[in-house]
From Swiss-Prot:
Protein name per its UniProtKB record: Light-harvesting protein B-800/850 beta chain
InterPro entries: Antenna_a/b (IPR000066), Antenna_beta_CS (IPR023623), Antenna_beta_dom_sf (IPR023624), LHB-1/5 (IPR002362), Light-harvesting_complex (IPR035889)
The gene coding this protein: pucB
Positions on the Cytoplasmic side per record topology: 2-23
Quaternary structure, from the entry: An alpha/beta heterodimer conjugated to 3 bacteriochlorophyll molecules. The core complex is formed by different alpha and beta chains, binding bacteriochlorophyll molecules, and arranged most probably in tetrameric structures disposed around the reaction center. The non-pigmented gamma chains may constitute additional components.
Source organism per UniProt: Rubrivivax gelatinosus
Family: Belongs to the antenna complex beta subunit family.
Length: 51
């Protein structure tokens, strides 16, 4: 692993692999954010003590 010039320290991933992993992480965070916003809107709409 240390001999491969394409691998980036310390993860051992290539730049392309790291970018792919980061894209998945960002996409997952966006999905989580949308679900969280939707849950907060529904909680506000359906709980009378928040009005």
């Amino acid at each position: 692993m240390a001999d491969d010039a394409n691998k980036v320290w310390p993860s051992g991933l290539t730049t392309a692999e790291a970018e792919e992993l980061q894209k998945g992480l960002v996409d997952g965070t966006r999905v989580f954010g949308v679900i969280a916003v939707l849950a907060h809107i529904l909680a506000y709409a359906y709980t009378p003590w928040l009005h």
